[in-house]
Amino acid sequence: MRAPLLCAVLLLLFVGGAAAADTNRYSYLSVDRVAINLSGTEATVVVDYRVDPGIAPLVAIFGRGDLHQKVRRVTGFEDGRIVALSMERAELVVEEAAMDYGEGSYWFPAHTFGVVVPSLTISTPQSTRQLARTDTFSRGIGYFGVPPTPPAA
């Protein structure tokens, strides 16, 4: 049992080094797109990716703990809570991703990703920004929260 596990670990190490040539790759993940939806101070991050076909069976057999770490690293949200994870997509919730400036105004600061993201979408209640082939969201974005609905009379 130790020999196959050792072979799998060594294979993962070699794949990580070979993957460095592709800018949207990190180890055995190739990122296709990232969508960030901002609401209040919370961000919901959806990342679509591909797992190398040779590694996919190993991830399925040995568990997805390493995949969790890699998804957090490529998104740059190491403290994000993964709420859904598959071999093609992950959804993270990041608490306190934006700063609350009071009176319903928020600021999502500049952010750096662990890879070059081919397609990045950042949505607020007021607007959507789309960027292509970037590893940073360099300017940040200000927005207003959705006003609470008044109670029915």
Language-model features: locations:
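Lumenal/extracellular ectodomains and adaptor appendage modules
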Residues: 18-153
